[in-house]
């Protein structure tokens, strides 16, 4: 589950729980799984009414597949598993007032990147799995070609550009290409797109920041 969260992989995790009437009594095999995974799921549900199941599953699949994708956990007590839903209806729409995923770029940050790009002499783009999940490979390639900017990728970003493309330098990080790492380290502007600034990709942060 934690790996799916880190890699932005949509996942629905269904777990079993003790009888709902026994929740909180520390009975045999009771585990606060929703609390245990709180830091590495997008959302978690503890179903206490069998009639909530259609809505919960509709919401869970929506949350897992929108915004930055990731895992959602649904914990179902044994009595709810054995209960019968009367007048089953799977909702057509989702109404989540508190869930508003970011789907548009930050205008001020984009303008800042453009200004920095105009000044840069050795810019480079590091693309991650977010580009693939957003199906934005074509837009990335067009942007790189229009501005003549080399592209490197994280492991999750392999496939953002054809390996034979003259602007694609390969994968960076601990297991990446030497020349790709060197190109990123010696750039004067690093544009991260759909990638986390993690140690697996940015293996030598001191070299990168030295030229920025």
Regions found by a protein language model. Give the residues of each.
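N-terminal alpha/beta PP-like core and its mobile active-site loop of ThDP/TPP-dependent enzymes
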Residues: 1-212
